[in-house]
Amino acid sequence: IFGMIPGLIGGLISAFK
């Protein structure tokens, strides 16, 4: 679970930037 969270956050940041 905690391993997937960084991936999701990273995807959102990439999409936001």
Curated annotation (Swiss-Prot):
Expressed by the venom gland. The keyword Secreted applies. It is found in: Secreted. It comes from the Eukaryota. The keyword Secreted applies. Its main location: secreted. Keywords: Amidation, Secreted. One of its GO terms (cellular component) is extracellular region. The modification Lysine amide is found at residue 17. Belongs to the non-disulfide-bridged peptide (NDBP) superfamily. Short antimicrobial peptide (group 4) family. Antimicrobial peptide with low to moderate activity against most of clinically relevant Gram-positive and Gram-negative microbial pathogens (P.aeruginosa (DSM 50071); MIC>400 ug/mL, E.coli (DSM 787); MIC=100 ug/mL, K.pneumoniae (ATCC BAA 1705); MIC>100 ug/mL, A.baumannii (DSM 30008); MIC=50 ug/mL, S.aureus (ATCC 43300); MIC=25 ug/mL, S.epidermidis (DSM 28319); MIC=25 ug/mL, E.faecalis (MF 06036); MIC=50 ug/mL, E.faecium (NCTC 12201); MIC=25 ug/mL, C.difficile (DSM 27147); MIC=25 ug/mL, C.difficile (ATCC BAA 1382); MIC=25 ug/mL). This is Peptide TtAP-2. It comes from Tityus trinitatis.
